Amino acid sequence: MTIAANLGFPRIGRRRELKTALERHWAGELDEAALLAEAARLSAVHWRCQQGLRINHVPSGDFSLYDHVLDTACMVGAIPPGYGWSGGPVTLSTFFALARGAHGTAALEMTKWFDTNYHYLVPRLSTAQQFQLTANRPLALYREARAVGLRTRPVLLGPVSFLLLSKTLDGSDPLDLLDRLLPIYRQVLRELAEEGVAWVQMDEPVLALDLSEKARIALALAYGALADGPAPDILLASYFGKLGDNLGTALRLPVAGLHLDLARGASDLDTVLEAPRPERWLSLGLVDGRNIWRADLRAALTTARRVAQAWGGTARIMIAPSCSLLHVPVDLDGEDRLDAELKPLLAFAVQKLREVAALARGLDEGEAAIKDELEASDRAARARATSARVNDPAVAARVGKAAPETEERTSTYAKRRERQRARLSLPAFPTTTIGSFPQTAEIRRARAAVGRGDMTAAEYERSIEGWIGEAVRWQEELGLDVLVHGEFERNDMVKYFGEQLRGFAFTRHGWVQSYGSRCVAPPIIWADVSRPEPITVRWAAYAQSLTDRPVKGMLTGPVTMLQWSFVRDDIPREQVCRQIALALRDEVTDLEAAGIAVIQVDEPAFREGLPLRRADWDAYLRWAVACFRVATAGVRDDTAIHTHMCYAEFNDIMAAIAAMDADAISIETTRSRMELLDAFAPGSGAAYPAEIGPGVWDIHSPRVPDTDEMAELLGLARGRLADWQIWVNPDCGLKTRKWEEVRPALANMVDAARRLRVRQAAVDRDGLPGDVGTAGSA
């Protein structure tokens, strides 16, 4: 019989119950016992839900109060110094201190989980690291499930992935700690076997990455050691991409089963079917666990049948999602306001598990057993392919006839710079902000009121005009050189634009976990994208009418809108991105026509889009750069195009950033004390040719830096860049800060820039050395 299996279920609950419980606990409104009771209740609800959906292998251990990588670190005793832990069970207060920081101790670093929009906490290890089993969490959760009537399949993050996803304090190779870590995993597996656990799922997602030979040897050593002792059957699971050149390693490991991501790694299947077949189970990830589209059940069933024929029947086949369903919302049934044409095309976690169960049944009993499911899948595919809304002929024609010249500015940057300087008349070290100002309780109340119908649209718009007017007056008084309107009308940097573009849709309850209690409801790009009317022009033009100083137009870039959405899967991502770029191009040129001389197109997710394998980077970077240029290249030479990127490793994509051909880029540099600028500096081998705004204020902290600190950071920037390149700005937008933090911090920032101008003028006049670094001055 084919096994219907799941790799992981969303943790947050249908109505974000986990978020509510966590935030009440952190606020002191819910004690530890009550929080743990709510976690146990949610887990039981999720287990019973999956059981009711006819899933044979229901996972346990996929639930977490914050992050599964942190759970693993705590289980194996990988607690760095400074958190008050001296061995034994890790308390909940220590767990949350690692996640969120406490009493002056910083939280662990957080970064993206592979190429998803989930974030994990990075374990910190050292060469002196000693591991210990603080508590057998998989065993405890298995027993918890048994208490409510289920035998589950415990899920563990594999030892090699755990180490490779960690960082060492001294820069040593985490894999050197494998011999010390393996006894902990062997003990966990032994105790699970003694409990009567039949299967355990060992996740090794690093198999989808470019691995060194040392890492491949580590996998062989690890699973050889785990097989040499009592243990349940191990299902080795990798996901997020093809195994490719790591497939041979995976096939040689002494495990009972292998899971394949056939949504993103379908090319692995032929190799697996051609390889020698020991008595191994094969788990087929036929239902995409990372997107929200209904599966093509007929095509998936055809693939499953091919495998069954090659595998000698269905006795050793599992059907599963491609990866954990952590990355999709819980249940589509609660979405009562979605477009009637869109909803039948979708599948959230619950619906995806129904698809898994249907495929398993169809493989065992034949097509007739799942006739209704197959017909519904076929209807959805036909409707999508023939819909005039999904496939807009006007958009297709525009994309098809866009000439290469669409991506090119009229002149080189050097010529544009002179014309922009003449138009803007800015001082040296011009000051600006990244775009948004604090979203106060008053703003949120007004937005909620207009949503409920308690405030008219006209009243709401008058309120926005009032906030913009106050912001413009205040920026003028402060002495900022290039102003912003404050983005008071915007709820979210992607949602705001998506709500006004054709082709986007939004859910009421389509929440997914970003990290901890932070949840996001990504837009759905379900149809061809176009702009029916201007989006931001009214507010930017209104702000500009209040001042003689330049006001920046503020847009979210095409790559970021793509990356932070659920993207249609019936056409290439590149094509979707180009559609967004053309829609934004219209907005950019309309802003210019309205008198806006500086237009910022933010791309904080530009680097996030990089594929997991380096061999695939160039193709992505080519179309990502092209789409940015399509969006921005339609303006005159004297209109400045700016962009903004968040904290990232820029060295390996500097050529692509330069190729975007923006007139200025602002980046997050405060925490690195300008070290990130090394990638942009003349000695880097790929010097950035245009202007740069290195952030001088860490806006992620409530702390207000003084003028001296900012001046010192600017001095460090001058040691790496020419003076003419440098803009002065915060690290990022100020939406999440409070006005009582913003006003003094920006006043200090303006003072730091003025101080720098005075010193530069003295040097230019008298040839005297300044007291800040000027190695890069020009």
Locations of regions flagged by a protein language model:
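Domain-level signal for soluble alpha/beta catalytic cores
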Residues: 1-768, 776-778
